[in-house]
Regions:
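Accessory terminal and edge-of-domain segments that mediate assembly/interaction
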Residues: 1-106, 112-254
Length: 254
């Protein structure tokens, strides 16, 4: 039933059925239950070529076509796909993957830091502030999305087994990359946000509506810690390969 509101983004319909469903094309596509859905640029395609992954399908958008791979990791099939940046396209593609069989999803990608955190540090978001639009179409309005304990535990178990230090954080998920004003950054920091990115709360909401497992491993890139001097650093590029390796292991162990 739809909950009406004067502000459209705060309206919500809890009916999981929509006029267009993610599997409306009726493709002959049956994806593995486990999936790594990663914001890693060309690293996904590079890894797929390196290991001889099968390209089993494509997600076609108006501007780009995204290959969907299946890799054999330690004897288990895992779906592998590059996630588009931004809450709306990332949510749409993940919903599509779920529609074709994915049930346990691990994501990874970079985040900006609001606190003094070194580049290429691994972080586990446990809560996301919903300053984007897509999540409000999947879950009723609230200030935060809480991450799933099972996913958090799976991520941290692998990090700890490998002796990789990490921090649990609250993240600020925003659609407004160029609207992270000084006052807003300070406000988010006061609330407890340590990092900022563009998809976490949206993907958590998709997972909640569809009843699947989803979690994310973030690693640090640019810094907004000094409001007077933005530092793009190296966008966390050194951690891309390691992040993908970790996510495959996390997905395998779930």
């Amino acid at each position: 039933m739809i909950q009406k509101h004067a502000i459209p983004i705060l309206e919500f319909d809890d009916n999981p059925q929509a006029v267009i469903m993610p599997n409306h094309e009726g493709l002959d596509l049956h994806l593995p239950k486990k999936c790594v859905y990663a914001f890693l640029g060309e690293e996904i395609d590079r890894y797929a070529r390196e290991v001889g992954a099968d390209c089993v399908g494509e997600f076609v958008s108006a501007t780009k076509t995204y290959p969907v791979y299946v890799v054999n990791y330690k004897g288990e099939e895992i779906c592998l796909a590059q996630a588009p940046v931004g809450s709306a396209p990332a949510a749409q593609f993940m919903d599509w993957l779920i529609g074709y069989g994915v049930e346990q999803i691990i994501s990874t990608g970079t985040c900006g830091v609001l606190a003094d955190i070194e580049e290429n540090t691994f972080l586990v978001p446990v809560r996301a502030l919903r300053d984007e639009g897509a999540s409000y179409h999947y879950v009723a309005p609230s200030r935060y999305m809480e991450m799933q304990p099972e996913a958090i535990a799976a991520i941290e178990r692998v990090l700890e087994a490998r002796g990789i230090p990490y921090e649990e954080v609250m993240t600020w998920t925003t659609d407004g990359f160029y609207r992270e004003t000084a006052e807003k950054v300070a406000y988010r920091k006061e609330e407890g946000c340590a990092v900022v990115e563009m998809e976490c709360s949206a993907l958590a909401a998709v997972a909640q509506l569809r009843g699947v497992l989803w979690g994310e491993l973030l690693f640090t890139a640019d810094s907004l810690a000094d409001l007077d001097q933005y530092d793009s650093r190296d966008w966390g590029s050194e951690a891309f390969e390691k992040a993908l390796e970790l996510c495959l292991e996390i997905a395998f162990q779930i």
